[in-house]
């Protein structure tokens, strides 16, 4: 049963023409995703532990989320893939400068914000959506995505629960 194709196409007409759809997840099949199989991913969330010492870990790919490009540890590193939820301004100069400099793959989930949104012509946009939207945080959904792409290991930090962020202890935003 195809539970998501129509929504992907209505939200992301420019980057939903080559979807992989399973019972759990749907995503635009970018050629870059083939190189993930058997590799190690470092996934950085916005919680306070993202500011801890994680750089000593060995990894092949670096992923993050939302305002990652404002973090002191990430702003000069190449993040290979970032999922952007409803909050970030993707027309802001600091976002566009980072994205263009590092050629980061930028992913979006189905959300009202993106319906009828006029995306620019950046060629590394993709859509990804799981059946677990709204039940799990974005980091957990990114781990599901990583599993579907065949990563052998997923290391992560910055997923400290909502309490720290509600208290204002966020690694990506002051």
Roles of regions detected by a PLM:
Residues 1-174:
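Metal-ion/cofactor- or nucleotide/acyl-coenzyme-handling active-site neighborhoods
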């Amino acid at each position: 049963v195809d539970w998501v194709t129509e929504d992907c196409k209505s939200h992301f007409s420019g980057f939903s023409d080559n979807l992989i759809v399973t019972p759990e997840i749907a995503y635009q099949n970018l050629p870059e995703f083939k190189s993930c199989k058997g590799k190690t991913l470092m996934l950085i969330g916005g919680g306070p532990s993202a500011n801890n010492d994680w750089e000593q870990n060995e990894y092949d790919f670096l992923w993050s989320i939302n305002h990652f490009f404002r973090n002191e540890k990430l702003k000069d590193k190449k993040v290979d893939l970032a999922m952007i939820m409803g909050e970030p301004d993707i027309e802001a100069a600091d976002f566009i400068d980072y994205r263009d400099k590092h050629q980061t793959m930028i992913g979006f989930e189905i959300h009202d914000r993106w319906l009828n949104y006029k995306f620019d012509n950046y060629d590394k946009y993709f859509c990804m959506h799981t059946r677990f939207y709204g039940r799990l945080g974005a980091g957990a959904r990114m781990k599901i995505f990583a599993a579907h792409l065949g990563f052998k290991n997923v290391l992560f930090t910055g997923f400290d629960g909502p309490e720290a962020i509600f208290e204002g202890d966020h690694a990506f935003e002051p």
